[in-house]
Amino acid sequence: MKNKNSEQNTHYTIGEQDIHYFHEGKHIYAYEFMGAHKACEEGIEGIRFTTWAPNAKSICVIGDFNYWQVEDKNYMEPITDAGLWSVFIPNAKNGDKYKFVVTNKDTSHYVYKSDPYAFFSELRPNTASIITTETQYTWSDDKWLEKRAKTNYYDNPMNVYELHLASWKTKNGKFLTYDELSETLPQYIKEMGYTHVEFMPLHEHPLDASWGYQPTGFYSVNSRHGDIIGLKRLVDKLHNNDIGVILDWVPGHFCKDQHGLIYFDGSPCYEYQEPTKAINKGWETHNFDLGRNEVKCFLISNAMYWINEFHIDGLRVDAVSNILYLNYDREDGQWIPNIYGGHENLEGIAFLKELNGVLKHTCKGVITIAEESSSWPDISTPVEKGGLGFDFKWNMGWMNDTLRYISLDPVYRKYHHNLITFSMVYHYSEKFILSISHDEVVHGKKSLINKMWGDLWNKYAGLRLYMSYMIGHPGKKLIFMGSEFVQFVEWREYEQLQWQVVDQYESHKQTLHFFKKLNDFYHNETALWQCDYDHHGFRWIDANNSQQSILSFIRSSKDNKQKLIFICNFTPVTYYDYHLGVPDAGSYKEVFNSDNLEFGGSGQVMATEIFSSPQSSHGFEQRIIIKIPPMATLVLKLIK
């Protein structure tokens, strides 16, 4: 098995070791010989096609090179008894379109299939694969990769901007190309102060409305935006602007369109044999057979492909619950227990551990993030310590609780105070990312601004309050595009964000400015990210003031030299002469206030320093007396 971290060779032949490791489920670079690759055999240049179809009777390659005719010379030959097929076609070349005609050995029924390992495909609604051998790119991100390999993300800032390329911006109603995005996106992300972008899936998918989460071409770059070189150039540009790139990745299930992986050889192949495990009724997709060696090779090699070939810095693994649970989205009687009688998918668990183990061993500095909504334990615990091995987990509980809380009339918030404090009870059980993702601003859930309570002023104030509270809460951060300039309509994947409102309305411009300042504040204050997962980094001052709906807490740096005091007022009431216990004697200065006039607030800021007095309060020996603005987060810092 070849072990490499550079782009694939222009010529690569299949060896005995490749075949052995592939069928053993241990090949992590299967894309180097599976699919369509440039080859020179007996002095003749051409393309070697290789695929896996264990229940095929025959496979013929048709395409531009043979006028899409089934010809004897283009039939693949079986090279193993376990379903590997291959053929060399001399006159096939880069850019030719092609498909496989796969005939099932039991029924003699044939189907036209796209190549599962194709690097590029036709733009929907067309479905042919495209021979793509010219993929070499001269990268200029060596410094970034060196830095990545040495970075401990747990004690560094991580503030992620999630986006959907097709609807971030368009040009005259058409998709922007990767090269066009390279001209605008990196600069915007850098100016706004985000540390990473997270792209929703970039592999090929037939339905725009699936957002990429129902893929057909796992190795095919999304052709809506251009080609492989264009995407590499975009990632390179982001890295050169000191921005990491995370990719949403979907290893649990696949689209059931007939040209794709479904019943690839006329029978269950990439999916489970058992229909109750194979068919995902909720999403109308098929679940991968994660216990089958060749399927594991397909998926783990796919993760390696995106990381090695496109220098992706992290994978956000989609729908992990669907991989972990046999009864996910199924009623009683619709699923079969495992060999121990439980609902755990033992094959899925083993796959996730193997995936994370491989990436940890081979891809220094690359992270994996689990989108998982259950209480499954030890998701972000290393595999060697009994966990699944992810680096981070989205905190879906925090997201649900706090969005519910922030939508309540402040009159009733005191009765639901636990919604805004409960997350700290379990925060240290995982390495959490606080995520407000695309799923929260679509399908009738309302835009983020419209989740806020009240009239327009209170909605804007509530958004600033909520985002400032989020920045102060331990854990890394993620926000979905459009929230930063207050898009009032829900996200629509078929049109660009409503950027025009920034120029048309001062309130949108002020909020965009607020997000930039908040992001800069986060990045510059080590207390906000250095101890996200260390008990030392967070301490409540008062978590129990439900009557006034006020939270107060301390964030600290590792050396304890930097301390920030957060006071979050979730009511539209100004509190005068508020007594607050503080950990140290001295002078305190306001360093951030979401009620600032420049953000669109009422301007109730602390213009002068406040000195503590030796009077006990909230369990501390020192106390300060402050004014707390309405619907706002106030952040104080000890300066002397």
Swiss-Prot record:
Superkingdom of this protein's organism: Bacteria
Catalyzed reactions per annotation: Transfers a segment of a (1->4)-alpha-D-glucan chain to a primary hydroxy group in a similar glucan chain
Keyword terms of this UniProt record: Carbohydrate metabolism, Glycogen biosynthesis, Glycogen metabolism, Glycosyltransferase, Transferase
InterPro entries: A-amylase/branching_C (IPR006048), Branching_enzy (IPR037439), GlgB (IPR006407), GlgB_N_E_set_prok (IPR044143), Glyco_hydro_13_cat_dom (IPR006047), Glyco_hydro_13_N (IPR004193), Glyco_hydro_b (IPR013780), Glycoside_hydrolase_SF (IPR017853)
Entry EC number(s): 2.4.1.18
Coiled-coil blocks: none
Similarity-based family: Belongs to the glycosyl hydrolase 13 family. GlgB subfamily.
Quaternary structure (record): Monomer.
NCBIfam families for the chain: branching_enzym, PRK05402.1, PRK12313.1
Protein name: 1,4-alpha-glucan branching enzyme GlgB
Organism: Francisella tularensis subsp. holarctica (strain LVS)
